[in-house]
Regions:
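Short alpha-helical interaction motifs and adjacent low-complexity tails used for partner binding
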Residues: 1-380, 392, 396-405
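Cationic, low-complexity basic patches in intrinsically disordered or flexible, solvent-exposed regions
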Residues: 384
């Protein structure tokens, strides 16, 4: 399943596309009724996704039932959940019943063992955040085959989205019979934080090498403990400012904290690094590209330390810095940043991903998702004699990896 974001009645909701929009119309129409029924409240992502899953289950054809894996074969982990979490699921089920309204009677037609709370638990444990080429979340979805992959904090594969397609790509050599793994959590966190998140969300204790050896934890928590503890505690407030798009307040507070602790907590401390990212985002949103570039440059070395190549997060950070350098006319620096970003991206994204390969035919200013080769074209024009090395010639080959449509 894959989801796209659309709007109706000023509410954001997800529409599941099966093959063509015409085929999805019956479920689209049912969901419109549900959204109207719940106004002015907005259902959570998990309730919306569960509703789409229920519609899918109720309309299953025989060919659908022959799919490789079904939601019933995935773990719900209900027995492992705390009473508090079960109570939360119960509240969501109540919301679901109100949301479904007259459609609620159809729940009795669900396959055996798939009651609403069990389904909700399966959805929350097995769904993925859908991201764009620059790793910004744009939705949630169920990819049932992908959900069977286990976690490792140093995985041998990454997942890359391109529109409706999710591609699993190897990021290092994989030995015969070696298990394919992905990361369920952001690795920009200490071993304790990663383990806590994985235990709470997915109900297992991570025993990977990176967690058991506490690899890089000393760097992540470098500096005076009292200082970085203060930074850690204020970050949720700053993220709230970011979600509310209060950019001036976010930049002002982030800058004050970075200035206050600059001598006692280094940039490689993960809480300073998160501050740098927040300050960079605020500066870009306020069109203060000079300040944004300053923070972006400071973040490059810590990103290199924690996101070993070819990690897409480091490539995206290099891409952001390169764009800022390009905007400011620092073309040689931009060329270097784009070259590094491309060398990384061609592994996890592939050389035919839209972010690395597409060449728009019209001369337009660079947008947030302008493909890398487009930037190289513009740099070549601006510097008159700059030629692309052979590595940047677009290759019309299918990316290595397993694609799940």
């Amino acid at each position: 399943m894959y989801l796209f974001v659309k709007s109706l009645l000023f509410i954001v909701f997800f529409i599941l596309i099966f093959t063509f929009q015409k085929q999805a119309w019956p479920d689209h129409k049912r969901e419109c009724k549900c959204l109207k029924r719940l106004q002015p409240r907005i259902p959570t992502d998990s309730v919306r996704l569960l509703t789409r899953t229920i519609f899918k289950l109720l309309s299953q054809t025989e060919s659908d039932q022959e799919e490789l894996y079904s939601i019933a074969e995935h773990q719900s982990h209900l027995a492992d959940m705390s009473e508090e979490k079960k109570e939360g699921l119960g509240h969501l089920c109540t919301t679901l019943q109100v949301y479904l309204g007259e459609e609620n009677g159809d729940l009795s037609q669900l396959p055996p063992g798939l009651d609403p709370i069990s389904l909700l638990a399966r959805v929350t444990c097995n769904c993925f955040s859908i991201s764009d080429g620059e790793l910004q979340d744009v939705g949630v979805g169920l990819y049932l085959s992908m959900s069977l992959l286990n976690h490792d904090c140093q995985p041998n594969c990454v997942m890359i989205f391109e529109g409706k397609r999710l591609t699993l790509r190897a990021v290092r050599l994989i030995r015969p019979c070696e298990e394919l793994t992905i990361s369920y959590t952001d690795i920009l966190a200490t071993s304790k934080e990663r383990r806590s998140h994985l235990q709470k969300q997915y109900h297992f204790l991570c025993q990977c090498t990176r967690c058991t050896t506490e690899d890089k934890d000393c760097d992540m928590l470098a500096g005076e403990k009292m200082a970085w503890t203060s930074l850690r505690d204020v970050i949720p407030h700053l993220k709230q400012l970011q979600s509310e798009q209060r950019w001036e307040d976010l930049l002002k507070e982030s800058q004050a904290l970075l200035h206050r602790y600059t001598d006692v907590v280094p940039d490689r401390n993960i809480y300073v690094l998160r501050l740098l990212d927040l300050a960079m985002d605020a500066s870009i949103s306020l069109d203060d590209y000079k300040t944004a570039l300053e923070y972006g440059n400071r973040a490059l070395e810590p990103y290199k330390l924690y996101y070993s190549d070819p990690h897409p997060s480091r490539a995206v950070e290099l891409l952001r810095v390169g764009k800022l350098q390009h905007y400011m006319g620092r073309l040689e620096e931009a060329q270097g940043s784009f070259t590094q970003a491309y060398d990384i991206m061609k592994v996890p994204h592939g050389t035919d991903h839209v972010l690395t390969n597409e060449r728009p035919s019209t001369a337009v200013p660079p947008r947030p998702h302008t493909p890398l080769l487009r930037f190289f074209d513009m740099l070549a024009v601006n510097q008159h004699a700059m030629c692309l090395p052979p590595a940047f010639v677009p290759l019309c080959i299918k990316p290595a990896g397993l694609e799940f449509n």
